[in-house]
Design a protein with these regions (language model features):
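Polyanion-binding and phosphate-handling cores
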Residues: 381-384
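Gly/Pro-rich active-site capping loops and adjacent beta-alpha segments
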Residues: 392
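Conserved "HGTGT" condensation-loop signature of ketosynthase/thiolase-family condensing enzymes
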Residues: 1-85, 105-109, 113-256, 264-354, ...
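A conserved active-site cap/scaffold subdomain adjacent to cofactor or substrate pockets
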Residues: 355-363, 374, 379
Length: 509
């Protein structure tokens, strides 16, 4: 097999358009710019893109045109490439690197471009100025083909009760973590600020960050007029920022093809380990303070091929944990066995709240940044993790300038996914009725920084009873009740759950 089937990343491109107006770059403009930056980084001509055999676009939150892969292929002269759209999920970019590295190793692909972008800041400005959607539609001959099935990451019942709101779900995970750790509300809140103040240190030094501003732990943790609560305990500064104009692109090929294209060996970045897992449905999980799918992902990224078998988390000099919310970072840190006081930075970009999270495509920016980081620090290793939905889909990759020894391979993800799938779901009901106990919760806030709605995940019975059915319910917006929920640890509190006309309700005793 050798060089012909050894996958390498050879070119990366990133664009952040902080200065913008109604006539600024569209989503496809940003993707095209990033693609050409990746070409420039690889040291090859734009005409080389005509030789792509595959082109994959990571879906934007709101697709700006009928078929973005076809439009981008037409723009860059890659019309012979097979064109795909990667559906929703922040795991997408790392999944693509993992999947197409395997395709290259198997001789099924030779030269691939991945790209993605969001221009939500510009789009929002256009809507405010004109009252119309951005005029970004471009001619396409057909609808896009999805690389994998585009499935909902929450059920209709879960969505009705607010679990489609990412801040709300991750805040519920955060409260479960706080309770499990035995922290007080005040202690844990400051800890969230301390976690993310280090992210702002990185963002402040980045030319690609949307908010290159260093903030203190207290500034991040304290709710103010400019930093309101979104979903308690999360303030605005703890939330992924998607109102941005950002893009990224990656070029993946084989060592043999790279040399045919004239790409210098010092551009080569090797994938030394990778993994992909999926979590159970939101209500079917074992708990909300940890993730079994993340645990298996962490195990497998260091174990699933010969290249990474001798590596561990202590060998990772550079890390970018997916960072949509603090619980995602802290859970990854704990899952990988890192201590709270580990001196290594947990981001190389500044993270989704401060670098900016280009929708589903953020991890393409973090991979691009990791490529640049390990090129600068030759011989080092970098770990990137990715998370889609509500801890729903996970992916990880290890990057280095060090060549992979022997043939590149990886364990079929289906083999370890089966272990996860074989664990029975926690029993749940859509129509709870009777005595119940809070398992976790959050309070959703309005733009006036006032609590609007409580959301509870609970059990009909005791928390320690594995047969106790799980449910999701709303807590009426009585201000004194909602305020109490933000001042005390309510996990383990009892109440009555019932099915209303449309929504489940929970009344605290």
């Amino acid at each position: 097999m050798g060089e012909k089937s050894m996958p390498v990343l050879v070119g990366v491109g990133q664009v952040t358009e902080r200065e913008f107006d109604v006539d600024s770059s569209s989503v496809l403009d940003l993707m095209e710019q990033a693609a050409y930056k990746a070409v420039e980084d690889a040291g090859i001509s734009r005409a080389s893109l005509a030789g792509l055999d595959s082109l994959v676009i990571v879906k934007s939150f709101r697709e700006s045109t009928r078929n973005s892969p076809e439009v981008l292929a037409n723009r860059i002269g890659a019309t012979d490439a097979t064109q795909w759209l990667m559906p929703n999920g922040g795991n997408g970019p790392q999944y693509l690197v993992n999947r197409f590295s395997e395709a290259i190793a198997n001789g099924e692909s030779q030269f691939v471009l991945f790209a993605g972008a969001e221009a939500m800041a510009t789009a929002r400005k256009i809507v405010k100025a004109t009252g119309e959607q951005p005029p970004w539609q471009e001619v396409a001959t057909c609808d896009p083909s999805y690389l994998v099935e585009d499935v909902e990451l929450s059920t209709a019942h879960e969505q009705q009760h607010g679990l489609w709101l990412a801040p709300g779900f991750y805040a519920m995970s955060e409260n479960a973590r706080r309770h499990q750790l035995g922290h007080s509300v005040e202690e844990h809140q400051l800890g969230l600020g301390e976690l993310f103040t280090r992210f702002t240190e990185v963002a402040a030094k980045s030319s690609h960050a949307w908010y290159p501003v260093q903030r203190s732990a207290a500034e991040i943790a304290t709710a103010t007029v400019n930093n309101r609560y979104v979903a308690w305990p999360y303030t605005k500064y703890m939330n992924a920022m998607n109102q941005i104009n950002q893009s990224a692109a990656l070029l993946l090929t084989s060592v043999e093809q790279a040399r045919k294209l004239g790409i210098s060996d010092d551009k080569f970045i090797y994938l030394h380990g990778c993994s992909d897992t999926k979590e159970k449905s939101i209500l079917g999980r074992q708990n909300y303070y940890s993730s079994e799918a993340m645990r298996v992902m962490a195990e497998q990224v260091f174990a699933n091929n010969s290249a990474s078998g001798s590596l561990g988390i202590d060998d990772m000099q550079h890390i970018d944990f997916y960072s949509c919310f603090p619980s995602a970072v802290a859970m990854a840190r704990d899952t990988f066995g890192m201590s709270v006081d580990d001196p290594r930075q947990l981001t190389i970009t500044g993270g989704l709240p401060f670098h900016g999270g280009a929708g589903n495509n953020y991890v393409m920016n973090s991979i691009a940044a990791m490529v640049e980081k390990v090129r600068e620090d030759r011989g080092s290793y970098g770990l990137v993790t990715a998370n889609g939905g509500y801890f729903s889909k996970h992916a990880a990759g290890i990057y280095s300038t060090n060549p992979v020894e022997g043939d590149w391979s990886r364990t079929d993800p289906a083999s370890y996914q089966k272990v996860l799938d074989d664990v029975p779901d926690t029993p749940s009901t859509e129509s709870p009725n009777g005595e119940a106990t809070i398992e976790t919760y959050t309070v959703l806030y309005g733009r006036d920084n006032q609590p609007q709605q409580g959301v509870v995940i609970g059990r009909l019975g005791e928390l320690g009873d594995p047969k106790a059915e799980r449910f999701v319910a709303m807590v009426d917006d009585e201000s004194d009740v909602l305020e109490k929920m933000t001042q005390e640890d309510m996990i383990g509190s009892s109440g009555l759950a019932s099915r209303g006309d449309k929504l489940n309700k929970f009344i605290l005793k």
